């Protein structure tokens, strides 16, 4: 009996405790989500700040904030990767990973996980869907008699990235219209824009859309 208990305790303490902090989440994130670096390379990156990734390039640690549970990595010359942890009301953890590539317009995605990498926040009531129309003033478009179909046809491609925050719990959604449209077209549509950033406000368990505003890069 004592031997069985000892083996059980050994196994428990041998497993990585993902909920302890953001570093563990980053190191053990399955490679299907982050193939540039394996767990050993990620551990080395947190210690040495720069490593050679699986594609022969350099990946660089840009930020490591254990207190605020945030990590940011430049995976390549044009690629970026972030992870962030929130603590829910029931004391469980919620994690997010965000990535984007700029060439030159920036485009990326975001995924959420519970502990042990179970996908989370798939309900639109927890994380709202983002539309290009969120960034435009519909009344101004209607005043110029720009139809919904004309608008959708012009913006059938939508470049956005999700920036996690090193010192806060909100998320910034940033569109990159300026970099994928030619200058003449951008100047035509700019008067109808409300902004190039949409703040997603953290409400202790879900996000809701907040203000849209401009900020130059």
Regions found by a protein language model. Give the residues of each.
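Surface-exposed loop/turn elements that mediate protein-protein interactions on large endomembrane-trafficking
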Residues: 60-74, 114-125, 202-206
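Short beta-strand elements that form the blades of beta-propeller/WD-repeat-like
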Residues: 93-101, 169-176
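Terminal domain-start segments
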Residues: 20-88
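Short, surface-exposed coil-to-beta transition loops
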Residues: 79-82, 95-96, 105-110, 155-159, ...
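Short aromatic loop motif centered on NTY/YTY
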Residues: 123-203, 208, 214-217
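Bacterial Sec-dependent N-terminal signal peptides
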Residues: 1-25
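Mid-length scaffold segments of soluble, non-membrane domains
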Residues: 94-129
């Amino acid at each position: 009996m004592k031997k069985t208990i000892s083996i059980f305790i050994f196994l428990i303490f041998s497993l990585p405790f993902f909920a302890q902090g953001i570093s563990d989440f980053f190191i053990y994130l399955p490679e299907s989500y982050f193939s540039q670096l394996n767990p050993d390379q990620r551990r080395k990156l947190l210690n040495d700040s720069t490593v050679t990734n699986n594609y022969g390039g350099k990946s660089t640690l840009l930020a490591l904030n254990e207190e605020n549970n945030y990590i940011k990595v430049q995976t390549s010359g044009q690629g970026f990767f972030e992870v962030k942890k929130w603590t829910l009301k029931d004391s469980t953890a919620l994690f997010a990973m965000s990535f984007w590539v700029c060439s030159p317009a920036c485009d990326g995605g975001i995924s959420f996980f519970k502990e042990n990498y179970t996908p989370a926040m798939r309900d639109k009531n927890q994380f709202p869907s983002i539309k290009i129309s969120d960034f435009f003033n519909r009344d101004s478009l209607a005043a110029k008699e720009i139809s919904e179909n004309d608008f959708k046809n012009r913006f059938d491609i939508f470049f956005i990235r999700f920036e996690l925050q090193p010192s806060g719990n909100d998320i910034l959604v940033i569109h990159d219209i300026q970099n994928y449209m030619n200058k003449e077209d951008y100047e035509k549509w700019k008067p109808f824009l409300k902004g190039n950033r949409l703040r997603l406000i953290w409400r202790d368990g879900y996000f809701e859309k907040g203000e849209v505003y401009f900020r130059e890069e």
